[in-house]
């Protein structure tokens, strides 16, 4: 879910997609930390290659070049190590490395930078995003966690929209929460179609990643009726 309110990250932290009950305390030694990290990295590759249902513990231990005994030192099941994979991966999606945009810059520039960072991180984690969709379809508890996390981002973006409205930089007649839900949902589905199911690969010409950034940014800006940078001193919406 795209985050256009980076400055508000701490106000409503999204819940983890990893079930806390499945996460053990990390090892206390450097060697233990390295071994656990290697297992998690190997598990991610196996899950992405085989899918959650078909992945086996023996596939993970072979990929990590370790024994079953070593695996059970750190994890008790496939569910446990999948939770560890999510714990690591979600940090990349939560903090995708958005380039700095000064607070006084126009809102469109902030939205564009946020969209670019989100889509870049989504592409980097495309295989995992497809895997999450698979798990959500078979695991009600995980689906609920994922929905709660998405809702936190929707609320965060809604606060950002409300701030723009208060500054006269967005259409004041829009309901911030409903608008955020619509635009955030659009972003996640477009990203899933472009990077996971590759729905647009039959189109001519092919949509590039930068095309996607520009298109979704224009949709955000137009939907919110954000004025262009050279008209920031004017209200976003004027009576006719």
Feature names for model-found ranges:
Residues 32, 40, 82, 86, ...:
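Amphipathic, non-transmembrane alpha-helical scaffold segments
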Residues 87, 91, 108-133, 152-159, ...:
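Helical hydrophobic small-molecule/effector-binding pocket
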């Amino acid at each position: 879910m795209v985050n256009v309110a980076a400055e508000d990250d701490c106000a409503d932290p999204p819940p983890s997609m990893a079930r806390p009950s499945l996460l053990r305390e990390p090892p206390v030694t450097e060697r233990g930390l390295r071994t656990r990290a290697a297992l998690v990295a190997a598990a991610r590759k196996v899950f992405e290659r085989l899918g959650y249902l078909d992945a086996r513990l023996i596939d993970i231990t072979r990929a990590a070049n370790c024994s079953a005994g070593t695996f059970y030192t750190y994890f008790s099941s496939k569910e446990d190590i999948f939770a560890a994979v999510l714990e690591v991966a979600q940090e990349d999606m939560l903090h995708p490395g958005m380039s700095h945009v000064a607070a006084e810059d126009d809102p469109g520039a902030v939205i564009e930078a946020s969209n670019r960072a989100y889509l870049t991180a989504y592409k980097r984690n495309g295989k995992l995003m497809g895997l999450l969709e698979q798990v959500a379809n078979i695991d009600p508890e995980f689906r609920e966690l994922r929905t709660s996390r998405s809702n936190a981002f929707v609320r965060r973006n809604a606060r950002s929209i409300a701030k723009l409205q208060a500054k006269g930089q967005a259409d004041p007649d829009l309901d911030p929460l409903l608008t955020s839900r619509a635009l955030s949902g659009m972003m996640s589905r477009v990203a899933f179609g472009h990077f996971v199911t590759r729905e647009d690969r039959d189109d001519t010409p092919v949509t590039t990643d930068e095309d996607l950034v520009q298109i979704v940014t224009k949709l955000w800006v137009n939907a919110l009726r954000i004025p262009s940078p050279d008209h920031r001193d004017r209200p976003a919406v004027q009576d006719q």
